[in-house]
Regions:
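Beta-rich nucleic-acid/ligand-interaction surfaces
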Residues: 148-166
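A generic structural signal for well-ordered coil/turn residues at beta-strand boundaries
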Residues: 98, 109, 149, 170, ...
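Extended mid-to-C-terminal alpha-helical interaction segments
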Residues: 165-215
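Juxtamembrane segments at transmembrane-helix boundaries
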Residues: 119, 139-147
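A short interface-forming secondary-structure element
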Residues: 114-127
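N-terminal low-complexity or simple alpha-helical regulatory segments
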Residues: 1-114, 135, 160-162
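Short, charged, low-complexity patches
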Residues: 125-129, 133, 198, 202
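Hydrophobic, well-ordered secondary-structure segments
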Residues: 86, 129-140
């Protein structure tokens, strides 16, 4: 929530309307241990993305206008398998911003989705990295109509004060202060067929943030 408020500040805008739309009291911004519900986070993110016209919420030097991530999913929809779909998603993400690079690889039966920072993300590092990885995982699960359990998550930053919440964000163990940002899962999932079509995409886009915001 504080990171989203910072995105408004960077644009010289007031986050209060977005906070009110999500029924979040502004004084929670000053309470380090404050918590909100997944639904409130969904409402806040949607309001902020529309008002800022930036689905990246200030993470990158270039704005990602409303609809950018939907476009990425649509470009992957015709892929025969999840492996091809994720490779497309990562490549096309690089056309939107070169501040980060995404890559899918596999070795010894383990698939890895790796995020590399190509410039310092500063105070928004955690928010950006977690959001992009969560979105990619959500897209992968949605495309295959499957739940993809994680074997391991690695993150370059130190454990934040709310590190316990990572048990909800990512399955399996999470390693902080790691050499790379990555999600690791059984490589067999890369062979799953893509099971969604344009009609399913249109329905999903009505509440696309559910792919990222995990209840």
């Amino acid at each position: 929530v504080r990171a989203i408020a910072s995105a408004f500040a960077l644009r010289g805008l007031d986050p209060l309307p977005a906070l009110q739309a999500a029924q979040i009291a502004p004084d929670l911004l000053h309470q380090p241990d404050a918590r909100i519900t997944a639904l409130q986070m969904e409402w806040l993110s949607a309001s902020a993305m529309r008002e800022l016209d930036d689905e990246a919420l200030g993470w990158f030097r270039r704005r990602l206008p409303w609809g950018s991530y939907g476009m990425l999913v649509r470009a992957s929809l015709t892929a025969p398998t999840l492996g091809v779909a994720l490779a497309r998603w990562c490549r096309h993400h690089g056309l939107l911003t070169d501040d980060i690079r995404l890559q899918v690889s596999q070795s010894q039966g383990v698939a890895s989705l790796q995020l590399t920072e190509q410039r310092e993300l500063g105070a928004l590092q955690e928010f950006a990295v977690v959001s992009v990885l969560r979105n990619a995982l959500g897209v992968a699960c949605w495309l295959t109509d499957s739940r993809i359990p994680l074997l391991h998550t690695t993150l370059r930053f130190a454990p934040p004060p709310h590190a316990d919440s990572y048990r909800v964000l990512f399955d399996g163990p999470t390693q902080f202060n790691a050499p790379t940002h990555s999600l690791q899962f059984d490589a067999g999932y890369l062979n799953l067929p893509v099971r969604r079509d344009e009609a399913a995409l249109q329905r999903m886009l009505q509440r696309a943030l559910l792919l990222t915001v995990r209840p």
